[in-house]
Curated annotation (Swiss-Prot):
Its EC number is 4.2.3.104, 4.2.3.198, 4.2.3.-. Its cofactor is Mg(2+); Mn(2+). Mg(2+) 3 binds at D453, E461. This is Sesquiterpene synthase 2. The keyword Magnesium applies. Keywords: Lyase, Magnesium, Metal-binding. It comes from Toona sinensis (Chinese mahogany). Mg(2+) 1 binds at D309, D313. GO terms for biological process: diterpenoid biosynthetic process; sesquiterpene biosynthetic process.
Amino acid sequence: MSVPVSQIPSLKAKGVIMRRNANYHPNIWGDRFINYVPVDKMNHTCHLQAIEELKDAVRRELLTATGLSQLNLIDAIQRLGVGYHFERELEEALQHVYHKNHYHDDTEDNLYSISLRFRLLRQHGYYVSCDILNKFKDEKDNFKESLTTDVPGMLSLYEAAHPGVHGEDILDEAIAFTTTHLKSLAIDHLRNPSLASQVIHALRQPLHRGVPRLENRRYISIYQDEVSHNKALVKLFKLDFNLVQSLHKKELSEISRWWKELDLANKLPFARDRLVECYFWIIGVYYEPQYSLARKILTKTIAMGSIIDDIYDVYGTPEELNLFTDAIERWDASCMDQLPEYMQIFYEALLDLYNEIEKEIAKEGWSYRVHYAKEAMKILARGYHDESKWFHNNYIPTMEEYMHVALVTSGYTMLTTSSFLGMDNIVTKETFDWVFSGPKIIRASGTIARLMDDVKSHKFEQERGHAASAVECYMEQHGVSEQEVCKEFYQQVGNAWKDINQDFLKPTDVPMTILMRVLNLARVIDVVYKEGDGYTHVGKVMKENVASLLIDPIPV
């Protein structure tokens, strides 16, 4: 339960100030993740040796596999999240698939294999014409009804259609066709429980839009039960997952101690205390071991950004927010005295964090990056300030006005910028200049974040007092129902996904490693806001997701 406003010291001298209170529920995890028990060194060494041997075994099979067997192995490696061990081999294999047509044999010229090939190539940025799917249509230009008996093929086509771009009507038709029939099959006709489970999950969460690490964890239970599974790959995944999970636990322990020492949850009780959920969010952006520093930096950044959001959205008065915005704009400790006490507490912590980040990354010669991160946070604060003024003035902007600001307050430009702070030298000054140029892929990611957030959270926000969301703005401007607005927004979200997919096609403006952060940020939103605001209101699904990635190891 939130501490009453009257207990915050800065308000005692000013008398009672009427403030909103969102009554956010407290942190549900307590100190669970603070205490980290390191892996036994001997076991750790044995696991590393075993992983190297298994990698060699999988690599040999990847290099010798051909045709559909090769595609299935590539797919399994990626869906189990161990692709980062085989980046060069996977890229060479897919280049070969792209440049050489493997489909002379009729046994491999079927719905499943063609859809799989299409998806794997599209996911790696290779343009493959969707016209290859025309062979599965009848004389009336509809997908053949006979396809509905091929459930693995239908599922493969469904997943393959999601990396589509604008103008590919056949992929939209494929999603509609497969969705309709797979729903019916899952309910009425599938006697194979494993296949039924795959279908139900895919309909709820398409692979292309899922959080990679969650999909890795889920897929092992399916893959290891397949008769044709690769035994070395299964063993590699289990050892690798547990080893990486141990690293994640260590990181979260370090971040949790930092958070507890700041004590912002007690000092600023009006704000959401969601550090564990923040870390889960960032695992969605990058889970691989080489991004350890980047994960720790980005988790701390998103946690501070969440409090800034609540200062503007929930607690600050117009006068205080003017001072706060000015202080962030100036980014100078001398601004501290002009702020009320609760803002001083936060402002000092914010400046300390960025000083800490700069000191850490200066060791690698990356000090220049912090300037961009600060600028992104300043832009975010300005956007929050604009929205707070709309609320206090009872102003409902047009959709055009709203989205101009809302793409900023989605936080995704700030998070994208900050996601590069701790990455290696593939990130350059030009990378940050690219972000600040407002590329289509980042605008699309922000659109997905903003519209999905607004659709799922606007009722709660309006009840406790909040600036008009996209839902209210659209209803006011166009005179339509909430149901019609949501339908329109989901269409816009679908279009934004096509924008992201388009920018992934080679040749790309920036390296794929950079683009992957933007894609993964959009994926996290799709998962966290699937059934509601899973960040603000931590429910059963979020608890299970956190447990699967940060608590429960894989039985070996």
